[in-house]
Amino acid sequence: MPSDQDFLDFCRKLIHGSGLGPTSPSYMRLISLCILLPIALLMDCLIIYDFVYTKNDIFKFAELLESLSSYGQLLIRKFILIVHEKVIQEVLELRKNFWKYETFGEEHANYLRREMITAIRATQIMVGLVTMIVLCLCLSSITNKEKSLPLESWTPENESVKCVLYTMQVMSMIEVIYLIGTVDSFYVVMCTEIKIQFLLLKEKLRSLRSKETIECLNGLKTCIKHHNLLLSVHKKLNRIFSEYFLVQYFVSVLAACVQLYILKYITVSLEDLLKSLVYLVAVFVQVALFFMLASDIEEEAEQLADEIYDVDWESTSDPKIRKQLLFMLMRAQEPLCMWGGGMVHINRNEYIVLFRLAFSVSTLLGAKAE
């Protein structure tokens, strides 16, 4: 079974390979910023421009929204890696101060590693679904004579230009696959790490119940220091993904709404039907990864306060221990929430609300089209 450090190295390698990491070679950064980013921005402009020619064609409008949400996934992840590069590096460095999984025995460590492996496999499933979507889009553009590009956008009549745009779209979609793997893996690993550290912290507090006064006091100081470290890492992680959460919320509503509309109200080819189904599942999995993990941390942080109460601080005669416990309890009682732009609370309830909203909007669009 891999060590806990292997999971961190996995993230570092992906960020390095994106060309936007602190250790990425200059030529990779040049390719990412001076070639791939302008291509993505150009394709976004062509998609937005094509809205002028929808002419009340609801299917074309839906496909353009799908294209726009797809490029939104690319640009927001580039934004994170470019703007929050230093904060990401700080988080990765702080991760080195986390407690080892083996702190409370090898059996407990193996359980924690399985938690991490499960989370990473969920990310791999997400990347696999995105890859399937890209293949479906490319297949659809080949088999459907009416489609000249994988993603709907404004297309000139010139065949040579169409070939160039096709190549650009394929390059962008390959980059989307890689960046989803990179950014989402970083988030999943760090959130799961924070959750695991809260589990270790609770285990440490349980072990202090039978300790002598001096040993208990030293243990409490260690717990408080580690708790403050986790709060700091969580705050930085929320800072990195705050804009992403907000954009992802609306992009996911948009993407789910479009796919639900296509599935419910439009007769499409087998390729388009398959693509819509995979796309919808991918959106569900992707949003679940972000919202569920944030909610897990929130719940673990709430349970920490109960563990502090169970240390039986009221019966101790040492005022230093009581003071340390009260200080830690005050911090633990503050809700540890993830927020998107200070507006969207990232948790399970909001996850359900998101898809209810998408379903409602798609139903309204269907009623309007009829």
Question: Where does each model-flagged region fall?
Answer:
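Short intracellular "coupling" helices and adjacent cytoplasmic loop segments at the cytosolic face
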Residues: 77-82, 88, 99-103, 204-219, ...
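Helix-loop-helix junctions within predominantly alpha-helical proteins
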Residues: 2-65, 97-190, 196-219, 243, ...
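Transmembrane alpha-helix/interfacial motif
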Residues: 60-81
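C-terminal transmembrane module of eukaryotic multi-pass membrane proteins
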Residues: 186, 242, 264-268, 274, ...
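Hydrophobic alpha-helical transmembrane segments of multi-pass membrane transport/permease proteins
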Residues: 131, 249-256
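Intracellular effector-coupling site of seven-transmembrane GPCRs
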Residues: 216-251, 322, 327-329
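Short amphipathic alpha-helical coupling elements at transmembrane boundaries
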Residues: 90-97, 196, 200-203, 207, ...
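Inner-leaflet juxtamembrane helices
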Residues: 77-95, 187-191, 195, 287-309
